[in-house]
Curated annotation (Swiss-Prot):
Region (Disordered): 373-394
Pfam families membership: IntS14_b-barrel (PF19435), IntS14_C (PF20504), VWA_2 (PF13519)
Name of this chain's protein: Integrator complex subunit 14
Domain VWFA residue range list: 2-204
Role, per record: Component of the integrator complex, a multiprotein complex that terminates RNA polymerase II (Pol II) transcription in the promoter-proximal region of genes.
Length: 518
């Protein structure tokens, strides 16, 4: 899951720290030392993590947008200036903005707040923000809890005794409470020094950034793998005394199911499954990063020559169009499948079902599934016209199906521009034009974005007025027809806003080629 590091650069972070030796340190230097340690660990063991760096005092600034380049993040740590007073609320508002712009409100995110425990002074201080928390309007609400799933880790460049001498610790604990209790406060044990700062950040790494290694098994075949992001324990709400359930480190494949049968099931989370190659001495050579490029290339070459069950499984699932059912724990299952990342690249993914003996109703109980060879006759029928499962979903979804994503403005802009490009090439691109138009129409109706339909209709009418004299007469009719259909759908009338309805091309008698026109 993405990480936002929020660094306090107010004047209080420049307070000197008495450290053994002649060199003078500030609390800011201790924080930079700890973050450098964190970034080095993530570059080696958590390199798929997207991380952003935000600095704040009375205002906030995005120093490094979300990236996997940890060298850039470490360079930014040495380029931070000192500013004025602390205002935590503005920093938390900044975190809300950058996370929602990049990832939306559904992706879990970890926020690492590095500060010295000073709450600021006057209006804008954390004391003032918490004191007025219950007196705010909805338009001026406090940024916690975050509008996305999150965990807030507060790294204090102060020891517990210093924080308890004021109300700083109570206010910081209130932040965790406001974030639905998701997070933790870390303080320096003992005097402020580099060693104790390393120990504090080491606790954060152990808690939140330890890679999840497991053994993937299928019969006698095994493979060491890393599951990313790390699966979080799941708490069953129905239990009287809920106990977090964690997945086993032994992931055993219990069978294979056709991808058409498993359809598009509800899942708790999705994870990459990455093989961990071992060299001849038994040491790991992947998926970490080595310092020397030549050593890295040679290690990858060695790893590429060693047979790996995880690679075999990935290729087999991709070719056969099947998924592997994997047991995560007692009465807890998931599935392994190949997901295309691009036309030439795909990844082995693992999705976690909800715990229980029957996570997918249309498959029945997992424990009662068996191989086709045990059946007296082909359960799918001789012509593949029936199913052995008790309940079939109405619509079977394909994992290769293109999904309309408008998380960023650029995604919506691209889809609209695609329609306009095809509109200028009518009637040759009639089929493509209506295909893209219906895709945008369905997405707009699904999101309740009716104003978009009105806006695209206006654009099509404008394109109609800009057609050159040499344009085919059918183009004007098709553009006018499409614009009218979108305007009708934008009114919200039920008979015109059916999701399954498609706008069909207008039937005309115009010839389609220049030869026919002559």
């Amino acid at each position: 899951m993405p990480t936002v590091v929020v660094m306090d650069v107010s004047l209080s972070m420049t307070r000197p720290v008495s450290v053994e030796g002649s060199e003078e340190y500030q609390r800011k230097h201790l924080a930079v030392h700890g973050l450098t340690m964190l970034f080095e660990h993530m570059a080696t063991n958590y390199k798929l993590e997207f991380t952003a760096l935000v600095v704040f005092s009375s205002l906030w600034e995005l120093m490094v947008p979300f990236t996997r380049d940890y060298n850039t993040l470490q360079e930014a740590l040495s380029n931070m200036d000192d500013y004025d007073k602390t205002c935590l609320e503005s920093a938390l508002l900044g975190v809300c903005n950058i996370v929602q712009q990049e990832w939306g409100a559904a992706i879990p995110c970890q926020v690492v707040l590095v500060t010295d425990g000073c709450l600021g002074i006057g209006r804008g201080s954390l004391r003032h923000s918490l004191a007025t928390h219950n007196q705010r309007s909805e338009s001026n609400r406090f940024p916690l809890p975050f509008p996305f799933p999150s965990k807030l880790y507060v790294m204090c460049m102060a020891n517990l005794e210093e924080l308890q001498s004021t109300d700083s610790l109570d206010c910081l604990e209130r932040l965790i409470d406001l974030n639905n209790g998701e997070g933790q406060i870390f303080t320096i044990d003992g005097p402020l020094c580099l060693k104790n700062v390393q120990s504090m950040f080491g606790k954060l790494i152990d808690l939140a950034y330890t890679p999840f290694h497991a053994v993937l098994k299928c019969g006698h075949l095994t493979s060491d793998v890393q599951v990313f992001p790390r699966p979080e324990p799941f708490i069953i709400d129905e239990e009287i005394d809920p106990i977090p359930k964690a997945i086993n480190t032994d992931l055993e494949i219990v069978g294979f199911v056709d991808i058409a049968d498993i359809s598009s099931p509800p899942v708790l989370s999705r994870h990459l499954v990455l093989p961990i190659a071992l060299n001849r001495e038994g040491d790991e050579v992947g998926p970490g990063i080595t310092d020397d490029t030549e050593d890295e290339n040679s290690a990858n070459q060695i790893a590429g020559k060693i047979p790996n069950f995880c690679v075999l499984l990935h290729g087999s699932l991709k070719v056969e169009g099947m998924v592997a059912v994997v047991q995560l724990g007692p009465e807890w299952y998931g599935m392994l499948y190949s997901q295309a990342d691009s036309k030439k690249k795909s990844n082995l993914m693992m999705s976690l079902f909800e715990p229980g003996p029957e996570p997918l109703p249309w498959l029945g109980k997992m424990a009662q599934l068996g191989p086709i060879s045990d059946a007296k006759e082909n359960p799918y029928g001789d012509d593949d016209n029936k199913s052995p499962f008790p309940l079939q979903p109405k619509n079977k979804r394909s994992y290769a199906q293109n999904v309309t994503v408008w998380i960023k403005p650029s995604g919506l802009q691209t889809d609209v521009q695609k329609i306009l490009r095809n509109a200028r090439k009518l009637p040759e691109k009639t089929q493509t034009f209506y295909k893209e138009l219906n895709r945008l129409r369905k997405a707009a109706l699904a999101f309740g974005f009716l104003d978009l339909l009105k806006g695209v209709a206006d654009m099509l009418e404008r394109e109609c007025t800009l057609l050159p004299d040499t344009a085919h007469p059918d183009a004007a009719f098709q553009l006018t027809h499409a614009a009218q259909q979108l305007k009708v759908a934008s009114t919200g009338a039920s008979e015109y806003t059916a999701y399954d309805h498609n706008i069909a091309p207008l039937q005309t008698d115009f010839p389609t080629t220049s030869t026919e026109r002559m």
